[in-house]
Amino acid sequence: MELKECVKRMEPALLQCLQENLRIPSVQGEPEPGAPYGREVRKSLDHILAAAEALGFATANMDGQLGWCEYGTGEEMIAVLGHLDVVPAGDDWSFDPWGGEIRDGRIFGRGTMDDKGPSIAALFALAALRDSGLPIRRRIRVLWGCNEESGSGDMKYYLAHKGEIPVMGFTPDGEYPVINGEKGIINVTYAREMDQVGDLRLISLHGGTAPNVVPSSACAKLSCSKELAQRLASLHAPKLRFTATEYGLFVEAEGVSAHGSTPELGENAIGRLLLALDTLPLEGQTKETIHFLAETLGMETDGLSAGIALWDEVSGKLTLNWGTLNIENGSLQMKINYRYPVTKAYEDCAPILDGKFTAAGFTKTAEMHKAKLYVPEESELVTTLMRVYREQSGLDGKPKSIGGGTYAKSLPNIVAFGPIFPGDEIREHKPDEFLELSRLMENAQMIAAAMYEMAK
């Protein structure tokens, strides 16, 4: 039977498996024995490994860090690498983010596009390739990681425990045709203490869910006299609400969520809130801190005022996302996610940003750095995937660079390939994340064809 027909026959089982896994809220949680990234992430991994075993594949679970199934008997191995962990659902959904609901030819839920949909499609693509009877000389391993959204500690564990390195492979966690360049990514956490003085005091402030998500909402509580609260509550500004309360003033800011790699597609609610607070009569270190943050970051997405506005011809501008800010009784913690161009280096930006924050009284308390990635267009890996893309889609195109970071940086000989086609609406990390059912099956077919071309 032709490979295309074998993939088509997998559709009902693929949809059922995907719906079941989408109903598991696999956001990183507290570590437990055998579940280093939380109970729900482990449930998601157990579910997909059980599905692989039901299809007749041998599976492996590496201490809850990641798992895989495999087909074939060759000495060399090619890999398809996806992830089951997802970012928090956030607000403003029209559907249950953990429902896996199918409506109007789309399946909705957190992880449909990033990355459960394509990762689970890879399992059924492997089953289709096996059922087709096409001969292969290399083993094919489909891996499911559990920590892609929060540092890729799973891949570090895989390499540290001598996990097998593929001769080539891909992660269906980017865009078509092929992503051969990925910006360097830095997640940094800053903290500081502020005094509480004056008639108007900042009690608390909260905004954002993760460093790699543009925050869609932020709010602040301020203590002040009833008279001052009533006067400030009369203020009006777009996407801001000022409300007088029994303790003083409550300020809410609205934004637009987007993926942290493309912050320019969103509107940062934290930045909007800080720009508003900067106009209020705060005093002391609180005033200084709010002014510094509003002036240095605000709602900018290119790091211009922070002094790190880098650019190159291959991958474009540095991008910066102010992902979280939390203040309680004068204690502040915040996280920034920024991504530098593929021809630049960590040293071109990190020391500059750190220096600005240190000079303003902040302390850097944590940092995660993923180095840039660039695979030449003429490499066997890129040319093979480009050929598959052209043959399967009927479309042309060129390899591209992105700001998003994938497992391609974590495992040698890997690039990102799919699942997003040119012109598709991108809903990853946003409310109402979905994947067109037709695109799900096109991805399954593309993955199966790529597996075969690499393994034959």
Q: What is each of the regions a protein language model found here?
A:
Residues 87-103, 190-197, 243-253, 358-359, ...:
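Acidic-glycine-rich active-site phosphate/pyrophosphate-binding loop
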Residues 84-86, 140-151, 172-177, 209, ...:
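Acidic, glycine-rich active-site loops and adjacent beta-strand->loop/helix elements
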Residues 137-145, 204, 291-292, 366:
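Beta-strand segments within the central parallel beta-sheet cores of soluble alpha/beta enzyme folds
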Residues 60, 254, 261-329, 339-351, ...:
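An extended, acidic, His-containing surface patch that forms the Zn2+-binding/catalytic region
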Residues 156-157, 161-341:
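Midchain, well-structured core segments that form catalytic/ion-binding scaffolds
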Residues 77-144, 150, 162-167, 430-438, ...:
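Active-site metal-coordination/substrate-binding segment of hydrolases
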